[in-house]
Amino acid sequence: MKIIIILLVFGLIFGCAKEEYDSAAPTYESLYNSSVTKTNWTHMGPLNVGGRTRSLLIQGDSASSIHTLYAGGVTGGVFKSTDGGESWKALNDLMPNINVNTLAQDPKNNNVIYAGTGERYGGFRGAGIFKTEDAGANWTSLDNSSDIWFVNKIVVSPNNSDVIYAATSGIGSAGLKKSVDKGITWTNIHSDYSVDVAVVNKDGTDYVYGYSEWKGLIVSFDGGANFTHKVGSSSILLYDYTTPNYSRGSIAFSKSTPSRGYLLVSNAAGQLYGIWKTSDYGANWTKTISQDNDTTKTDSWLLSDSTDVFDHNGNGKNCFGGTIDLNDLRSQGNYDQYITVDPADADVVWVGGIELFRSDSAAASGSFNKASVWYGSEGSYVHADQHYIAFSPTYGRDMPGYGGTDKRAYFTNDGGVFVSTNSKTGTTANPCEYSSIGVEYKEIVKGYGTTQYYHGAVSKDGKYVVGGLQDQGVTLYHGSSDNWTTIAGGDGAYNAIDPDNSSIMYSSYIYISIRRHNITVDNETGAISNSSGGISSGIDTSTYGKGSFINPFILDPNNSSRMYTANKALWRSDNVKAASTSDVTWTNLGTFDGSNSGFEITIAPSNSKVMYVGVGYSASFYRILNPADGP
């Protein structure tokens, strides 16, 4: 086996001739008119699986029993439903940027909607703010915002719909911004990276609340002219890990009692740092919950996976009977975090972390109970990783056409959109028990094409397509846009289909975790029979690392019994079709330079003696000759 290393110096390649490149770059309009319109594409689906969604709004304050909804997928753009989420339609999936992170509606004109792009806590750069004046039929870019990388939150002033506030961050134009002309021009009213903003109407004046990343809560009682730090400190430097407690924050104020507000903060590790409450419009704040890494305190699991962290009583046992350190990687409050207040009751507070939690006692210590479960098929199931909660505009009112008091709430997460019609019912104080949760949810994702595929494979006969999704498992296509079946859960990653036998498929979970599937499809009913087992246990991950989060593997295109994968070493199996998955063996072909893992592997389709491997962040590419002959 011969290895040739090719080093690409990105500074030279991309740095040279920048002016010539920029001047010759095709415009969005030219690309749209020349290539996209001349190519016919059909949406294969899945139409029954939703993807990561960080924003949702409900049109207007009507008394209709059926809501018109708008949802922003982080891939896919803005979708609209006119039947309460039973079906969805993409409004404009050819916008220059479809990474929608936040939505806001003009309170005086339902046809005017703002969409902020760029996902600060997901890694996708945006292109500022887009606006529609015809309920989503057409969208235009607000030009003076186009250099904003991450638009984290947009709020239209409740006093004057000409005034808009935007919390923004990133290397481009960043800060807490204000527009007084419906988004035509923008002014920074606070320069720190801003990740959330809330606005309360107090006697005709906008009280503005912003959360500055790592620095904490800022408050203005004069429409943003002057700000005061209320929680945290202006002296903390961005990404200062010596004082890592004020990482991400979320703000919520009560609709029924506007003087009441809450602040949720996670630390740099993604754990709950604290919850604060104000009862005087933000003049004073009291910390009601303090996690502070003390495992004896309650509520330590609010922003974490309750199956993997200390339970509500701090006794060190996780839900599956084992013990685990509180600093577990499943603490991810910097990725999924939200706080909101019941519109009819200022004491009822919802928190979204990996799961949903609710306090009926004004966020007092020990008062948060579990309100959903991310596994199983019970009525309390909601997909993991919560991002947003929106209540019906008529929440808490008696609805003659609805059949009682409106308790509808919509929840967005990594699985799309869910709705509950009884969101005020029972919760449980035990994070490891869910049978007593009374809140029931329904998944509403038909037509909501917002999934994020990491990788996919097509069978040689074109009959099957298998793909790995972000947090939605591995899906198998077998006939139509509605005929997609999940064959593995969690995060889906790389996939392959045996070119000689399309009923044999391979999928992977995060890191090096490869499975072999034997698939049988009933041609009459479309039912799937899926027998699977892991085949990567023979790879040494303790010495050579667990690989990349989304780790590559590849079948040899000229030998369907041979597979390659990589961590800090390159591995080959010559018997991936062994009678038992436990009999699959692996050979170490050698290590890469440094501590980088293989990121991508490809083999020449006509010559298995030529392989290329892209490695880590070092811009190194390995050309490997005769990999089947090594080591």
List the predicted regions and their residue ranges.
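C-terminal motif of bacterial Sec signal peptides marking the signal peptidase cleavage site
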Residues: 14-15
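Beta-propeller blade termini and top-face loops
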Residues: 19-631
